[in-house]
From Swiss-Prot:
Tagged with keyword Transmembrane helix: no
Protein name: Small ribosomal subunit protein bS18c
BP GO annotations: translation
Ribonucleoprotein is among the record's keywords: yes
Source species of the chain: Aethionema grandiflorum (Persian stone-cress)
Amino acid sequence: MNKSKRLFPKSKRSFRRRLPPIQSGDRIDYRNMSLISRFISEQGKILSRRVNRVTLKQQRLITSAIKQARILSLLPFINNQKQFERSESTPRTTSLRTRKK
């Protein structure tokens, strides 16, 4: 079937191409903490290549830089700083129970 004879013509949606997360001038290095921290989740896990939208080579360099920074203790291995909110404590009710002997 010819394109001009289609019953339901497809509407052309415009899209904006996203900027790459790593610019050409950025060096992927274990000391570049501002760059590395963009590729780590809140728990401290390395985000996947699909989430990061980087090439395979860039992902390998990021992974090795993160691991190197972890070993040199520039980054934590896990980020599990749970912030507990203390609610007001309720007073304990003591019952006057006696044990049977």
